[in-house]
Amino acid sequence: MVRRGAMVLLTMLILYAAPSFALYGLADFMSFVYVGAIMIVAFGVYIILGRSKKPGFKEMLAVMLISALTAIFLAYFFSGSEVIVPKLKSLGLFAVVAAMLLALARVFRLEAEADFSLRFFLKWILVVAITFTILSVFMLFLRGVV
């Protein structure tokens, strides 16, 4: 479970870092540090919850809540209160992505995979691709392009 969780954490960090770096370059590096720290805290909570039993939906919500509180603390501690609102918007979008990933992972039965195999990895890529396709179409509708 730890190995699979570490691979998922690394995948999520890359998924956050790639578009962030493409859009903002190194100017958004501190945001990447925030999100990396948040994900590490969330991963630690996930592992702690996973030791007692298999983490379910309530445990995932607890991880997201702790992640949100960590984001608020880091934003206030490092940058002052003026960046809390943009960071919360960014965290809200990330929470939507994470919730969609969890829901689609349940649909594709990723929790039933016993080990981090090629089959698991291909299913995970499919889940991520579907999630970002849905979000992209939604963003196009919000901007009035479609």
UniProtKB/Swiss-Prot annotation:
Annotated localization: Cell membrane
Listed GO CC annotations: plasma membrane
Major subcellular location class: membrane
Domain of life, source organism: Archaea
Keyword Cell membrane: yes
Membrane topology: Multi-pass membrane protein
Transmembrane segments: 5-27, 32-49, 61-80, 90-108, 120-142
Keywords noted in UniProt: Cell membrane, Membrane, Transmembrane, Transmembrane helix
Protein name: Uncharacterized protein AF_1584
Organism of derivation: Archaeoglobus fulgidus (strain ATCC 49558 / DSM 4304 / JCM 9628 / NBRC 100126 / VC-16)
